[in-house]
Amino acid sequence: MRNPEAPRLVGVYRRVVPVGARRVIAEHVDSGFRQQVKEGIAAAAAKRDQINRVRVARSHRKLLARHDRRVVSVGKAPRIAHVVPRATPLDARRANLDDVTEALRHAGIDYFCVRSASETSTAVAVREDDREHVITALRQACRVRPGYVIPVGKGEPLDEAALPAFGTGPWKRVSGSPVFRCTWYRTDETGRMVFGLRYGCDIEFWHQEGGELVSPRRNPVAEAVPVEEEATEADESLFTDLAPLPEDRIPRAGEDLDAGDGAAGGPRPGLVRTRPAFAAGSVGRRTFPIDVVYTWVDGSDPAWIRSRAEFSDRPYHEEAANAARYLSRDELRYSLRSLNLYAPWVRNIYLVTADQTPDWLNTDHPRLKVVSHKEIFSEPTSLPTFNSHAIESQLHHIDGLSEHFLYFNDDVMLGRETLPQHFFLPNGLGQYYLSPALIPFGEPNSEDPPVAAAGKNNRRLIAERFGGSTIFRKMKHVPHALHRGVLEAIETDFADEHRRTAASRFRSAGDISVTSSLHHYYAFHTGRSFPGDQLVYRYLDVGKPGAERVLGRLLAEREAHVFCLNDTTSTESELAHQQALMTRFLDEYFPFPSPYERGADD
């Protein structure tokens, strides 16, 4: 898909031209003409990129003779990338570290891994005295498998400045650098996902001062280590919060967690070679598991449709039974893909359904469990239910669920790497994300949208429980960081309202919204959560004008940690168009299956 929002010129226009001026232009220039201009720019950029890729391919035919290599475009720059089926950011990080350390071991060069400030790149320390041997070893590795190098100073290196390390000239540029980064670009089979310098490995040259090796730059742990100190092994989760905790880790394909890597002489899988200072667990390190819970409904299931029809004569508000609310656009499939890509630290995933299972779901995956409403509802007479407020009120009853967990709606996706601390601090405190949208004042009534009515009820309960404290704001549509203990307290403290919500088959004016609002305000008042501001978030109602343009920007920029694709306005006649629009976008953003899909490993 050619994205008219992707070219750099379009991005520069938005950054340079003030919002007011852009509005004036929009008022006086036909939208169709503006779209034609952007499409023309996109076509020219695509042609330029193609020419550059062909030029590189012709210049390096031998390097590209293998089927698992291809030329990709990163910004304006063509790069030789290694095709890794279903590669993830954590995979790219691990692979670059493995490539560097294997080259060093093969050359007999001592090294140790360093904990750096980055969660995506790695860092390896070598002795300054070994500089010539290090450069020779890595230069040879980059000739065999084409890689790139760049000196590292302040700030994150830019992909367009990376130097092709399969030539001789670039090594002269980095030969005297205290730190340089070595990267082998990775891409998936489609070429749409490219993992570049952000996931590379920094080589730090530590010099000797007396009995110590001293770092050329600061790091979060130790700037000097004893020269004669023995190396040790440490879990990779000590070096990046992207990695799962040791007890939550499952083997990669063909990997034995109990076996050493005898052939290469390296550390066991999941471990890295380091020094004792870097193997120590820090005070700020997370030690508790985090699970994910989804609620899902198959709105096309004939049995479910018949059941819903039996109870849906008089929904109190048109949004309460809006067809778009129950329509499955396969958002769950893509949300799980986003979780696999950008939150590999999650332990288990629970999918709560009305005895429904997507036919594409890999229910044999060890991290995934489908949970029936029947397993969690305290009162069986409340079923069947078609009320998300009711279902959400029962999530803490899931057997085996961790104390700290994230609640995802299936229309919520991760758009880039997220970390546990975006949701929970290492001491267990949760973070919630306030929306600028306000809860209306007044008593709930039949004219209120369901979210407004529930917000009003939440407001009353918080004021009564915590001495007149008034809540004003709604929450953003992000993964909700929840505590089971808080949900249990809400069920006890607000027993009547909780029971009434659980028993309401459709959203009603008497509902409370437990997971998406009430929990956060209750947890705040009891010292277990606080307002967060770390997530870059985008919300889009796909039924509104301009949705295609906004989706194009999301795809081009990939800067949002979280985005939500909601639909509160589409009529049934508009759903087919919205379906096509969303599917096209999501296939581009998440182009390959996750392990949670059947046949993903075929």
UniProtKB/Swiss-Prot annotation:
E.C. designation(s): 2.7.-.-
Gene Ontology biological-process annotations: polysaccharide biosynthetic process
Top-level taxon: Bacteria
Pfam family, one: Stealth_CR4
InterPro entries for this protein: Stealth, Stealth_CR1, Stealth_CR2, Stealth_CR3, Stealth_CR4
GO molecular function: transferase activity, transferring phosphorus-containing groups
Key words of the record: Exopolysaccharide synthesis, Transferase
Keyword Transferase among UniProt keywords: yes
Keyword Transferase appears in the UniProt entry: yes
Region annotation (Disordered) ranges: 251-271
Other information: Stealth proteins are part of a protein family that is conserved from bacteria to higher eukaryotes. Family members were first identified in microbes as proteins that help pathogens to elude the host innate immune system. Microbial stealth proteins are involved in the biosynthesis of exopolysaccharides. Stealth proteins are predicted to function as hexose-1-phosphoryltransferases.
Family of the protein in this entry: Belongs to the stealth family.
UniProt name for this protein: Exopolysaccharide phosphotransferase SCO2594
Native organism: Streptomyces coelicolor (strain ATCC BAA-471 / A3(2) / M145)
